[in-house]
Structure formats: C-alpha cells, structure tokens
Amino acid sequence: MRPILLSGHERALTQVKYNGDGDIIFSVSKDHVDADSHNGERIGTYHGHQGALWTVDVNPDSTLLATGGADNTLRLWEVQTGKLLHTWEFNTSIKRCEFSPDGRQLLGVTEKRSGHLSTIVVYEINPDPEAKQSDEQVLRIVCDESKATVAGFSYLAKYIISGHEDGSVTQWDGKTGELLSSNYDVHEPDMQGYALATKHVRFDANRVQLVDVEDLTVLKSYVTDTPLNSAAITPVKDYVILGGGQAAMDVTTTSARQGKFEARFYHKIFMEEIGRVRGHFGPLNYVAVHPQGTGYCSGGEDGYVRVHHFDKPYFDFMYEVEREAAREQANL
C-alpha cells in the first residue's frame, strides 16, 4: 500500500476531507486550504483567510466548499473557480463546519473565548453559486454548560450531535435545536472529535468509543497505548481507522517509531487491532476514508497529506466467523 505524498502545506494539517465522489481531497492547515486530486495532482488553493484554518467541508455536489479558521470567519467558496462567495463573521474562531447530508444547510461551531460562549450555528445554503447567501441563523445553540469542541449532522439531519470539553455527548433536534439528551459518561474531559456514519465515533486521550446516535449509548470501545487525534469508520469493511501519536510538543525528541505516528486499523465489531500504517514524521491530526472505501488519507503535524489506496489483501481479510457467514449467505 504505497502512499501518494502531498506536500502543499508548510505548517501542520488540521483536517482533510474527500468530496462525495472521492476524486478530490481538500486539506486545511495552519497556513491555507488546498484541493488535490486523489492521484496527487494539485488542483488549486483557496486564498482569503488570515491565520490558521481549523476546518473544511464540501457539499454533496462538490460545488461549494466551506472553511473556518482562527480569523473568526466561516467562509463559502465555489469549488471550481476558487471564488469566495460569502463570509460569516463571529466573535471567536470557527472550530468545525459541516454541510447537512442534502447540502442545504451549513453548521458551524464557535470557540469559547474572551467572555463569549461556544455556540453551534446553522445557516440555510442556496446551492446556486451565483445566489446571495443569507446571514440569518436558522439555529443557534448556546453551549453554556461546557463548550462544544465538535458537532455534526446525523443521518437525514434528524439530529445534531455535539461533543463537549467535559467529555459529554449531546443530541439536539436537527430542526428546532431543542436539547433531547446527553450522555456524560462517554469520555474523559477534553473530547477531541468525531467521525460520522450511521453511528458516531468519539475519542479522547487514548480511547475511541462507538456511540449510537439514537440513544447515545456506547456500543464499542477501542483502546490504544498512544494519544489519539482522529478516527474514521470505513465503508465496505467493518473497520475503524485511528490516528494520533505522541504530543506535537514532544516530537523533536522522539523517533517516528517511538512516537507511534501511525494509522491503526481496528475491527469495528471485534474491537481488535488488525494492522498499522506508518510514514508520518509527527502525530496524525486527521484521518479521512474514501467514500467508496477504496482508501484513506491522513494529515499530519509534519505538514504532509498521505493518500493510501487499499490493496487486495485489505478486502480479502476476514475472521473465520465472517467467512462462515459469507459462505452461508452464498448458499441461500
């Protein structure tokens, strides 16, 4: 599984994202936002933010791109031309942005700082790049108990699921913003993030939890011996990919092997580690999986994006119980 190395950033990566077709990878870092094809060709750079960028997302049609950063703005771009379409301004940084599954809404999470509480905001989005976008917030959720570090839409935007600094996970009504339920026993304080599929993956220092979005119960737990920064659920195969490594402040005194700067693959059902992929020279800050499950990419503290395409053994690997189930299914 030889990777393609993308080196368009000079500072640490903060998020990487595939578009819906899996042929474009968007990456943001503490310098700017890039777009690259899945085979490593540079497509373009989006200029306009001042300072570090924390988050990026692309709508389902791959026509609109959203970014948020430390300049206290959430921005909307036209993917094809790189044209800045709209800017929403806030009092604090934008830590996470995400389009709804239909692309008609855009969610943003603001930082808690300087007397301003963390908020989750939602805007209606007109998919036409030539149309004027609204500044009116259709939802505004103020997180007065514990700041939201991450949030996203569930399937069909039925819920908004947020992770908080105190380790709790909260479920909000996707239409009204009403608080529906919270689970305070999911993680230790300072939850880092999530990955969304039918269920959520949430992680803290060295543990990943698979959480059901309907009732916020913890379904599975994946424990490692290294700090974690990101996790992703793979389609096609029942795997979870974990990324992390020794804290960035310590990497200058640590070799790549000792720092455990690697992507780790766990079986989603059996919770066992089944493989590792090395290569980064610093912690993995974000991992993202190809929408068709044919590969994954990782963004690191070293400023590189590594794009991996899965080989045949990845798809052939099965536990014996999985092989038996497959044989029984074939005989029906």
UniProtKB/Swiss-Prot annotation:
Its main location: cytoplasm. This is Eukaryotic translation initiation factor 3 subunit I. Component of the eukaryotic translation initiation factor 3 (eIF-3) complex, which is involved in protein synthesis of a specialized repertoire of mRNAs and, together with other initiation factors, stimulates binding of mRNA and methionyl-tRNAi to the 40S ribosome. The eIF-3 complex specifically targets and initiates translation of a subset of mRNAs involved in cell proliferation. WD repeats lie at residues 8-47, 48-87, 144-182, 279-318. It is found in: Cytoplasm. Belongs to the eIF-3 subunit I family. Component of the eukaryotic translation initiation factor 3 (eIF-3) complex. GO terms for cellular component: eukaryotic 43S preinitiation complex; eukaryotic 48S preinitiation complex; eukaryotic translation initiation factor 3 complex, eIF3e; eukaryotic translation initiation factor 3 complex, eIF3m; nuclear periphery. GO terms for biological process: cytoplasmic translational initiation; formation of cytoplasmic translation initiation complex. Pfam families: EIF3I. Keywords: Cytoplasm, Initiation factor, Protein biosynthesis, Repeat, WD repeat. PANTHER family: EUKARYOTIC TRANSLATION INITIATION FACTOR 3 SUBUNIT I. The keyword Flavoprotein does not apply. GO terms for molecular function: RNA binding; translation initiation factor activity. The keyword Chaperone does not apply.
